Amino acid sequence: MKIPADLYYSPSHEWVRVEGDQAWIGISDYAQHELGDIVFVEMPEPDDELEAGGQLGVIESVKAASTIYSPVGGTVVAINEELEDAPQLINEDPYANYIVVVAMNNPGDLDNLLSAAAYEELCQKEQGGE
């Protein structure tokens, strides 16, 4: 399981890569592995407002449908349109294939997220509970 050290993570298995005041958001390797083959990604529209901890979209796999939560609040400035026709790209490389880019309205939201080490610990606890 890959957990890049330069990203932030949420307890609900989303990742955040920050560049300036923008946040790229996707789901983690752990999440895509648990979901299995991804067949559909429902994404917000550009200019939609997202709340930290609020619903960002839905991801569907052959196993289940799962809500995607926004780790940070802000305005959607871009979506990964490639996922509309090829949602399986998330399975192939979850960290290269973001879901949305958000212009953050409160960079303090990042303080509520996990480091790579803390996220790895969370994943190990969840795996141990199965």
From Swiss-Prot:
Keyword Chloroplast assigned: no
Tell me which residues make up the Lipoyl-binding domain.
22-103
Family annotation (InterPro entries): 2-oxoA_DH_lipoyl-BS (IPR003016), Biotin_lipoyl (IPR000089), GCV_H (IPR002930), GCV_H/Fam206 (IPR033753), GCV_H_sub (IPR017453), Single_hybrid_motif (IPR011053)
Q: Which UniProt keywords apply?
A: Lipoyl
Which terms does the UniProt entry file under GO BP?
A: glycine decarboxylation via glycine cleavage system
Cofactor annotation comment = Binds 1 lipoyl cofactor covalently.
Q: Which cofactor does it need?
A: (R)-lipoate
Cellular component (GO) terms are: cytosol; glycine cleavage complex
Task: Decide whether keyword Cell membrane is in the record.
Answer: no
Q: Which residues carry this modification: N6-lipoyllysine?
A: 63
Instruction: Spell out the family assignment given in the record's similarity comment.
Output: Belongs to the GcvH family.
Q: What PANTHER family would the database entry show? A: GLYCINE CLEAVAGE SYSTEM H PROTEIN (PTHR11715), GLYCINE CLEAVAGE SYSTEM H PROTEIN-RELATED (PTHR11715:SF3)
How is the subunit organization of this protein annotated in UniProt?
The glycine cleavage system is composed of four proteins: P, T, L and H.
What role is this protein assigned?
A: The glycine cleavage system catalyzes the degradation of glycine. The H protein shuttles the methylamine group of glycine from the P protein to the T protein.
Under NCBIfam families, the record lists: gcvH, PRK01202.1
Q: What is this protein called?
A: Glycine cleavage system H protein
Q: What is the lineage of its organism?
A: Bacteria, Bacillati, Bacillota, Clostridia, Eubacteriales
In the UniProt record, the gene name given for this protein reads gcvH
